[in-house]
């Protein structure tokens, strides 16, 4: 199971994604933990079993057990937070004075470098389409000294993984009915 398997599974019309996936997996902008945590978290956020299985297997070879769990923790907490903050944003400030009352302890104690956890949360929030969370995580990353290039590379990784998941879902669905 690997990035190579995903590239091989992509249909011809997704050739750009195949090339982008190969490029992003060799990035020098992100360190290994940042890259593989971002890829794993983004894969889980796509909800595509094949993408998660393939990237998850390769991520396990490139991340410590603690980082692997933290990346999945970022997906879990952002699954809740992205819905909550995106929904609250739709309400145009009418509920901003109310306390969320949601437990988010993993954000304070992720078990890995907090900037890496923020990077993964930023990527997942991008996949999930929560503009409030994307902006908040980007701000935290920049305050922590993470460069614009690294933030942008994580965004590209999330976008590529999301595109791969959509292409594979389309191909699998059409193959099943065709």
From Swiss-Prot:
Disulfide bonds join 130-133. It holds the Pfam family CMD. GO terms for biological process: cell redox homeostasis; response to oxidative stress. It catalyses: N(6)-[(R)-dihydrolipoyl]-L-lysyl-[lipoyl-carrier protein] + a hydroperoxide = N(6)-[(R)-lipoyl]-L-lysyl-[lipoyl-carrier protein] + an alcohol + H2O. The active site is at 130 (proton donor), 133 (cysteine sulfenic acid (-soh) intermediate). Homotrimer. Antioxidant protein with alkyl hydroperoxidase activity. Required for the reduction of the AhpC active site cysteine residues and for the regeneration of the AhpC enzyme activity. This is Alkyl hydroperoxide reductase AhpD. It comes from Mycobacterium ulcerans (strain Agy99).
